[in-house]
Each structure stands twice: as C-alpha cells, then as structure tokens.
C-alpha cells in the first residue's frame, strides 16, 4: 500500500500542479517526473499510518457515487414526466426518419429520446438556440461508431467516407441535414468525451438500463456476476521508475495506467500496460445469457478484489438490487467484510491456497467433531463467529455420545467455508453458471471494438467503456445479431423414418 500511496501523490501533483504537462516534450516530461518523484520520496514517512480512502489508492476516486446520479426508479419517473411538462413535443429528427433502413439503427432511433439525452449530457449553460451541434448528436456518433465501425479511428470516422452525401443513413441517424455537407469534426468528439462528468456518464447508463429492464431480456430472478478484462494502452516504456521497498513504481505517459499481470495467453505477453475494466453483469439463469450492466476502470496493476466493494456501492447507488454475486477466485470475500458493508453475498470457487480446517474431509466434503469421530455433522447455519455444525448421529450410534459437545463452529475463509459455503446446492449452481460471465467481454471487446481503446486517458476509457456497454445492451434488445437455431438436417429425418 505504501507504493500505491507514493504513486497517488505523484499522480496528484501532475494533475493539479502541472495540468499542461502532456503538451511538454518527452525529455521535459522525464525531467519534471524525476523532480516530483524525488520530492515525494524525500518527504514521505513510511512509519506514518495511512489515512487515505481506498478509492484514491487505486485511482478510482472520480468513479464513486456522487450527488445527482439518478436511480432506476427516479429515471423512470423522470422519463414519464418529461414530456408532460411540455405543451408541444418537437422532434427535430423526424424529417430524417425515412432515410433509416438498417433495422438496428431504426430500433435505436426509436428507443432513445433526443431531448432527454440533451438534458442528461448537456454542459452547464447549454442553450440549444445557440448551438449547431447538440449533445445527442455527439452521443449518437459515439454509439454509431461502436456498433457499425469499431475497427477504425475517430479521425477516419469523421470524414466524407462515412458522413458524405452518399451516406444518407448515417447522417440521418446522427441528425445531420441530408442536403448539406455539414459534418462533425473528430476534435468535437474528443472535447465531448473530455467534457462529460462521471455523473452525466452514469445518468446515461441509468437511462439505457431503464430501457433494458423494460425490454424483457431479463427475468425476475437473476444472478449477478463480476469479472475483469484488460484494456491495453499504446505505451511501452515508463517515463520514470523509482524503487520502493525493493519494488518498482512506474509512471507512464498516462499517469493513471500501470503495468499488471494477466492470464497466460498463447499470442500475448503475460504483462499488460494499461487499464483493467471490472464489470458487473446480470445472468438469466433459465437461458444462461449474461448482459453487462456497469463497469469501473482502474490501473492494471491493482488486485481485482480491491474493486469489488466500490463497484457494488456504485451499482446500489443507481438502484440495481443485488443479493448474490458469482465471481472468480480473485474476488473472494473470505472475511465477510463485503457482506457486512454492502449486504451482498459473494460466491467464488474455493481457493487452493487455503488449508482445510482440522477434521474436515475434502472429497466428499464432510465435517466431524474431532479426530476420534467418523460420523458427519450437519450444517445448521451461520453466526457472527462462523459456520455452525451439529451432531447428526442417531441415538446410541456414537460411542462418545456422553462426553461429546455435539457442536462445532468453523470460521469463514476463502476455501469451502466462505460466508456463503460452497457445499450448498445454491452455491454450486452459482459457481457453475459463472462461465457465462465471459460472453459480454467477448462482445464488448471483439464485436464493439473495445479491445482497441483509441483514447489516451482514464477518463476517455471510462466514456468508451460506458458507450460500449450501452451499445451491447441495445443490440441485445434489438435481437438482430442473435444466432438462429440450427435447422434439423432433413437427411437425419429420413434416417429416422427408415428406422
């Protein structure tokens, strides 16, 4: 944690005391970073106790619940009353609707209300009468790129090739006049992303989630899951490296990113420089389909378990109700702190690093009272001290019946005895369904193009991940890219009839 605190202080000085340092030459950046790092190291007292919030240590202090983020219920009421307060409903994009032929774009155009998007994303002092380009147009451009053109750069996207007179459908979807050559420059999109606050991003997410919950893609009984995926940045070497307790602290061109480890992959390095996206998903138990709901973006070097509590709190502030989360071993809640703080059970596969308690057999799992007893005990519940087991022997079955206490408590751990024990049927089913969590990551990174972030800051990655999540949700709602069930082979029917 000391290394995280030192990196936090360096990052804070760069952002607030030198806001224009990104425009400096590389040699000047290195010199400035070395001066700041030396100053922080000389003034840092390792013996002093840290009183820094976890969110600041892991670099997500800008992604915490803030005032102004609406819940799902508040958003539903806001949408219901929005047009009731207006005498006339004017749709400036109505004249372009006959240009839309793509079923996906037609569905999205009918789903999102431009006036509501303007109120959610408009900057302070926004005046529609004095604007040629409105927030809803810029948001639609981001959405169009994620859905139709994820593989190209922003600079190429904002050209005649995609918004010229021959591209009437794209112009109609964004809201550009069909009879002019007016276009939106890529720098306007860049300024739009930089100008969005976290409150605006989350309110737009809540707006999309409101429509998603109304679409019927999920049932009443759902299980939530959490997993992470790396988002590499276009940087290879640190500008400055310092030693803290024998370990390196690296500062890159983007001070918020860092070097972390990832799972072994055949065609990729085991290390990645960039960010890691921690995503909350909703799983439909009857179909096994999972959908992304919300993400937090942090540096790749931090352990996954540090992001689980902030992610749950952010989801709860948006009105997402959770009871059970299934995740991998990196998100263990062995001490039960997450359950106490958020009221959400976290279930993960048992960790191989945790030793079994005394007098516990692993395969099949059974608990006995002591080393002399061979009769399995029954699980009766959980208390503040741990998991409680009682004797399950019949009368006169146990030879130690008169001297045995017939009761045992096993503390919680990250193995089989988690706050929600893994030997329960519900836990086993939740662990089995965890494999479906990987599907949204494959869609967001491969289909919607998030694997190449094409932005150069943490804030840009946050906006890109939010837009990509919304794009994934609307495509699932549209249902245009679902695989059709394979038709049965007629030759097999012939063989069955021949019998």
Regions found by a protein language model. Name each.
Residues 4, 58, 64-138, 142-150, ...:
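Dynamic "connector" segments at or just before major functional cores
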Residues 46-47, 157:
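Short alpha-helical "recognition helix" segments of helix-turn-helix
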Residues 427-499:
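Basic, amphipathic alpha-helical segments enriched in Lys/Arg and hydrophobic/aromatic residues
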Residues 130-205, 219, 459:
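Short, positively charged, Gly/Tyr-enriched micro-motifs
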Residues 159, 190-339:
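Polybasic low-complexity intrinsically disordered regions
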Residues 298, 302-395, 421:
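An internal, acidic/charged active-site-proximal segment
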Residues 3-21, 28-46, 53-56, 60-61:
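Amphipathic alpha-helical segments in structured regions that serve as interaction surfaces
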Residues 161-162, 329, 360-382, 411-458:
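Short amphipathic alpha-helical "interface-anchor" segments enriched in bulky aromatics
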């Amino acid at each position: 944690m000391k290394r995280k605190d030192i990196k936090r202080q360096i990052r804070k000085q760069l952002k607030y005391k030198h806001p224009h340092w990104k425009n400096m030459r590389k040699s000047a950046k290195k010199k400035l970073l070395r001066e700041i790092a030396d100053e922080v190291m000389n003034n840092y007292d390792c013996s002093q106790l840290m009183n820094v919030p976890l969110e600041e240590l892991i670099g997500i202090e800008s992604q915490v619940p803030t005032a102004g983020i609406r819940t799902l219920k508040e958003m539903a009421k806001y949408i219901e009353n929005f047009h009731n307060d207006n005498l006339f409903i004017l749709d400036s994009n109505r004249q372009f609707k006959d240009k839309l032929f793509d079923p996906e774009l037609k569905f999205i155009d009918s789903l999102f209300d431009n006036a509501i998007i303007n109120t959610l994303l408009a900057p302070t002092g926004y005046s529609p009468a004095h604007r040629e380009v409105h927030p809803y147009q810029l948001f639609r451009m981001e959405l169009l790129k994620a859905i139709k053109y994820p593989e190209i750069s922003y600079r190429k996207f904002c050209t005649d090739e995609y918004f010229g007179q021959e591209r009437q459908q794209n112009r109609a979807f964004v809201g550009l006049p069909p009879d002019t050559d007016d276009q939106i420059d890529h720098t306007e999109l860049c300024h739009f992303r930089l100008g969005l606050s976290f409150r605006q991003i989350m309110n737009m997410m809540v707006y999309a989630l409101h429509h998603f919950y109304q679409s019927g893609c999920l049932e009443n009984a759902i299980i939530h899951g959490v997993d992470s995926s790396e988002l590499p940045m276009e940087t290879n070497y640190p500008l400055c490296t310092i030693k803290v307790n024998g370990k390196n602290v690296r500062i890159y061109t983007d001070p918020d990113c860092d070097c972390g480890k990832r799972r072994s992959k055949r065609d990729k390095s085991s290390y990645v420089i960039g960010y890691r996206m921690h995503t909350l998903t909703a799983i439909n138990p009857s179909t096994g389909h999972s959908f992304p709901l919300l993400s937090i973006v942090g540096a790749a070097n931090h352990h996954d378990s540090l992001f689980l509590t902030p992610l749950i709190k952010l989801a709860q502030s948006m009105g997402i109700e959770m009871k059970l989360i299934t995740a991998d071993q990196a998100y263990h809640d062995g001490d039960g702190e997450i359950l106490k703080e958020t009221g959400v059970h976290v279930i993960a596969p048992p960790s191989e690093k945790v030793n079994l308690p005394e007098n516990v057999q692993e395969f099949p799992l059974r608990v006995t009272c002591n080393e002399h007893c061979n009769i399995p005990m029954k699980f009766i519940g959980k208390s503040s001290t741990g998991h409680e087991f009682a004797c399950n022997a019949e009368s006169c079955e146990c030879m130690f019946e008169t001297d045995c206490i017939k009761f045992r408590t096993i503390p919680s751990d990250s193995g089989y005895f988690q706050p929600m024990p893994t030997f329960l049927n519900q836990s086993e089913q939740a662990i089995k369904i965890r494999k479906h969590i990987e599907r949204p990551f494959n869609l967001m990174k491969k289909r919607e193009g998030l694997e190449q972030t094409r932005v150069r800051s943490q804030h840009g990655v946050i906006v890109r991940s939010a837009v990509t999540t919304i794009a994934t949700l609307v495509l699932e709602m549209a249902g245009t890219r679902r695989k059709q069930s394979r038709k049965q082979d007629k030759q097999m029917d012939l063989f069955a009839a021949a019998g």
